[in-house]
Amino acid sequence: MIQITLPDSSKRDYSGPVTVAEVAASIGTGLAKAALGGKVDGKLVDTSFLISQDSALSIVTAKDAEGLELIRHSAAHLLAYAVKELFPEAQVTIGPVIENGFFYDFSYKRPFTPEDLVAIEKRMAELVAKDEPVTRRVLPRDEAVAYFKSLGEYYKAEIIASIPANEDVSLYREGKFEDLCRGPHVPSTGKLKFFKLMKVAGAYWRGDHHNEMLQRIYGTAWATKDELQQYLTMLEEADKRDHRKLGKELDLFHIDDHSPGLVFWHPKGWTVWQGVEQYMRKVYQNNGYQEVKGPQLLDKTLWEKTGHWDKYRDNMFTTESEKRDFALKPMNCPGHILIFKQGIKSYRDLPLRYGEFGQCHRNEPTGGLHGIMRVRGFTQDDGHIFCTEEQILKECVDYTTLLQKVYTDFGFKNIIYKVATRPEARIGSDESWDKAEHALIESLRASGCEFEISPGEGAFYGPKIEYTLKDAIGRQWQCGTIQVDFSMPERLDAEYVGEDGARHRPVMLHRAIVGSLERFIGILIEEHAGALPTWLAPEQVSVLTITDSQAEYARGVAKTLQNQGLRVNLDLRNEKITYKIREHSLQKLPFILVVGDKEMAAGAVSVRARGNKDLGVMSLEAFAERIASDIAQKA
């Protein structure tokens, strides 16, 4: 007798071993039809999995997160099946699930074309319509290697050969196609109705640039037609908001082949940068931070002490001078400890808060670079707080409150909070971890935040809070963080004199609110679709003349506004006013002021707000008050 416990705690008895599919069928035909897999004692399995002992079982359907994972995993194999049908000489390699979809890498004699993608997608739909069952079998490793070699699938054979010899491997078959996979999979191809192939890109075999360049086909798959359409619509909107496209259209920045992964800021883009930096500088000044500046080039021995040399060496730019090895800093924290160590520090000095707009460099692979959001050189609003364990709670509460205000000012209202707790491998006593985790959790509770716990996802040297922004089209961007660090003060011998007169190690809190300024500006551009709020816009007002006769008056208007600290563009060109209005509107300016003879005679301006809103004629003084109010309110 086998007893199955269901999620509602009800129990069902079966006379002998039973599959997940059979349990689903015994509950109801609707559930049997919807079943994609099961979770047996917490482990995700196929519907064909045989349960041979008393177990807890939940049936997984397309409504579950695990169900969507199964759909995407199986869709990757369906893609490989279709490619092998159409291009028999192609060799299959790997095909994992990724965020919102999947990909599969192929080796083929020529690049796949957009027309090929259309044909592959069509064949996938045909295979779905056939509703072919997906079956699993297990082979000894060496037998599996020989099997795939006999098929001419040498990449797959190489993967299997790297598995320990005493391990069996599982294969999944659908129709004529069989692939190596741990599984689980959906029960049949008919469960994979809602998918779309997105693009083809290059990818090196095993991620090594010394190996062959493969072709990676990306796709997306969803549980319903509506979800697929919503995702495709979101992608269309994201494309319109793409910061790389808007950066060019609005003349903000460019990336040049002469310096891959580094940003050339144009005058307007640098104005935005300065707006963000000066705002964050005031945040430092108003919240007890002392701004510091450390060198970019630091001796290798420092990075060896901190542990970065062992873990991040491949991502560091290095150089040699006078028989000494140096590295461009990938992060600012060691430099801040060196500043902290200058002079004796007392418990009365704590908490001591340092802030820096620190320029860092990381040798990111070319394929991972993405506009100004993923670069090799970036500047962080990097702060470090040196404090005692007892001070962690208050510092975290204050930091969260500050972060919320900053994000609100930049137009972000939706923040997701996560606490990453101790991993298995860690340093420090359990007592210290207890205090640190308690402080982080209580700081969020005190701030009125709902939050998630991410067990085991803290760093080996301390727990952290991650602050993730949700943007206008539902995408998530992890920006802010506050990280407790017990390790680095120990490694670099940072000390303070306690109230007892003895030497003590400070706790170090790593914190950043916007993180990389480059990335944050990219997020801002996409969040606002290029129409940055008035206080941050590179040009806040354009003054346009209708004819040459208003030129002198327009200059006076522009000068008056500039004297009030506004960023003003003056357009005196002898062009049609409709043309000029359209041109400046495309630059997404907050306000356009048109001056003709009537406005000049009245000492006024005709005001157009962004979005083609005609605010009518108003005095220059009234307009100045209006825009000043918008700026003050961060509108």
From Swiss-Prot:
Residues 242-533 are annotated as: Catalytic. PANTHER family: THREONINE--TRNA LIGASE, CHLOROPLASTIC_MITOCHONDRIAL 2, THREONINE-TRNA LIGASE. Signal peptide: none annotated. The keyword Iron does not apply. Residues 1-61 form the TGS domain. One of its GO terms (molecular function) is ATP binding. Its EC number is 6.1.1.3. Its main location: cytoplasm. This is Threonine--tRNA ligase. Binds 1 zinc ion per subunit. The keyword RNA-binding applies. It comes from Polaromonas naphthalenivorans (strain CJ2). It is found in: Cytoplasm. Belongs to the class-II aminoacyl-tRNA synthetase family. Zn(2+) binds at C333, H384, H510. Catalyzes the attachment of threonine to tRNA(Thr) in a two-step reaction: L-threonine is first activated by ATP to form Thr-AMP and then transferred to the acceptor end of tRNA(Thr). Also edits incorrectly charged L-seryl-tRNA(Thr). GO terms for biological process: threonyl-tRNA aminoacylation.
